[in-house]
Amino acid sequence: MTRNGGPPGRIEHGFPHLDVVRASITALFRRLSADGIRVYDTSFAPADAAFGPDEDLHLGAHRVASAMVRALRLPDARVVVAFRPMEEAATVELASGPEYFVEVSDRFRTHRADLAAALAHEVAHVLLHRLDLRFPATADNEILTDTTAAYLGTGWLLLDAYREDALTHQKFGYLTPEEFGYVLARRGRLLGEDLSAWFTSPRAYEAYVRGRARADRDHRRAPLAAAGTAERLRYARARRAGTTPGRGSAYRFEEHGAGRLVSFPCPVCGQRLRLPVRGPVRARCGLCRTVLECDT
């Protein structure tokens, strides 16, 4: 895992990986099921990530790693943590298990507060390895790993480790701060969780708010009934013309023997739904079982 995914001194912002992030959430639902996702309803506790003032470094690292393993529901996995000089924050050896070796940078000997963030990413790698869930491209796999950590309750630590000011530039993981906020907000909406009070980094909280605003927009896209006026007007024009909307539109019209259909992604899991174009309708997503109010 890298400490800073961008050029030295520069941290990337915005939502450049959003398509892969959304695909990652869909992949998690398909692999774990809606009930399997809801098992991860409790985020990693701040107390489990903290080091006591007199706590031994190695014992504390193994305590945090063990708590991370429990949080990600890996009951038979064991994570062994070792420190060494390295440029990356951490790396994991993905063997057949049940024992996995994680190497972390020596800088965590003094910056212990961020050790749990580094372990969150690496233990998420272990979970995905166990699930046999991966994307073809290495870069996309790293996005999948960060998304998995955030969506299943441990990755908020990666965002909280983000620092950016005149003297400090620090970011763990491969998602931008805003993308971490986006994933955490989608998790929060699903499970009724609000992490606002957990962030110790003001910049992390600001990124979380920006990500949450972007996640909220997913629930206001046509043909969802909650779409705003401008969005509804654009949808109505495209529906009358029978044309595929421009780039950036989530919905697509399809001709079918029984009439026209509109397809669009579920705002919760990303699975595409196909509904008849006929006005107000209530639909249940077959993957996450969310009931959606729509106006097609």
Segments from the language model and where they lie:
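Charged, low-complexity intrinsically disordered tails and linkers
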Residues: T2-A27, T91-T110
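Pan-zinc metallopeptidase signature
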Residues: T2-D19, A23, K171-T296
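N-terminal, Lys/Arg- and Ser/Thr-rich interaction peptides
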Residues: P16-F44
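Auxiliary, metal-adjacent structural segments of Zn-dependent hydrolase domains
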Residues: S33-G97, R107-R112
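A short, surface-exposed helix-loop junction/capping segment
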Residues: D41-G52, L127-L128, P245-Y251
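Short pre-active-site segment immediately N-terminal to the catalytic Zn-binding motif
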Residues: Y100-L119, P136-D140
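Active-site recognition of the HExxH zinc-binding catalytic motif
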Residues: A116-L133
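Post-HExxH zinc-binding segment in Zn-dependent metallohydrolases
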Residues: T138-G173
